[in-house]
Amino acid sequence: MAELVVALDFPAADVAVDMAGRLRGTAPWMKVGLELFCAAGPDVVRAVADLGFRVFLDLKFHDIPNTVRGAVRSAVRSGADMVNIHLMGGERMARAAVEGLHEGAQTTGSVPLLFGVTVLTSTAQGELPGISTDIGEYAASLAASGAAWGLNGVVCSGYEVESIKKRCGASFLCLTPGIRPGGGAGGDDQRRVMTPAQAVSAGSDYLVVGRPVTGAADPAAAARAIMAEMAAVRR
């Protein structure tokens, strides 16, 4: 069954942890991204985890292999249950990330999930410099590489999930941002969006939702409504 990940896209730890506290008993996952992590560091990962959530540390590592290996190792030691890298970093970087994942797990006793970013959901067809391939085909090709390199899954839009599952197998996980209840872009920078029901029907395993939950008058109610929509889909 697909799971909801709420994005804590805030500039300060106190605001993020307060929001996570308001969401206890709803979504099983919280996402800590670049803005929050740069403001608060690893302590915010631990603070959110202490509230009973699993934490997706969304830092999209993309650097030389040794640097990524160390960064992933540190991310795991911070208490993250899921981390990610950019697949465009290539095979050596991806395999180094897998090594860092297992090195970090020697401290924590638990191996997190490692995902590879294919194409950002804020990117539309024709916006990738020097790449004329169909964006869906390009994402599926990157995903197949990620599967071969030992990753657990990929970050992709809902539009690529079916082709990725066909190429990589049903057990290869797909995490989908750009989820918008009602299907609207919401006035933000996401381009390739889906409703929760559409994404679950497409086969997504994790749905990332930020502002439609955290910006709602009642965030817990908004999260529960999305989870109910997800649960109603049979696939």
From Swiss-Prot:
One of its GO terms (cellular component) is cytosol. InterPro entries: Aldolase_TIM, OMPdecase, OMPdecase_AS, OMPdecase_bac, OMPdeCOase_dom, RibuloseP-bd_barrel. This is Orotidine 5'-phosphate decarboxylase. Homodimer. Pathway: Pyrimidine metabolism; UMP biosynthesis via de novo pathway; UMP from orotate: step 2/2. SUPFAM superfamilies: Ribulose-phoshate binding barrel. The keyword Endoplasmic reticulum does not apply. Catalyzes the decarboxylation of orotidine 5'-monophosphate (OMP) to uridine 5'-monophosphate (UMP). Its EC number is 4.1.1.23. Substrate binds at residues 9, 31, 58-67, 121, 180, 190, 210-211. The active site is at K60 (proton donor). It catalyses: orotidine 5'-phosphate + H(+) = UMP + CO2. HAMAP family: OMPdecase_type1_B. It comes from the Bacteria. GO terms for biological process: 'de novo' pyrimidine nucleobase biosynthetic process; 'de novo' UMP biosynthetic process. Keywords: Decarboxylase, Lyase, Pyrimidine biosynthesis. PROSITE patterns: OMPDECASE (PS00156). GO terms for molecular function: orotidine-5'-phosphate decarboxylase activity. Belongs to the OMP decarboxylase family. Type 1 subfamily. It is an enzyme of class 4 (lyase). Pfam families: OMPdecase.
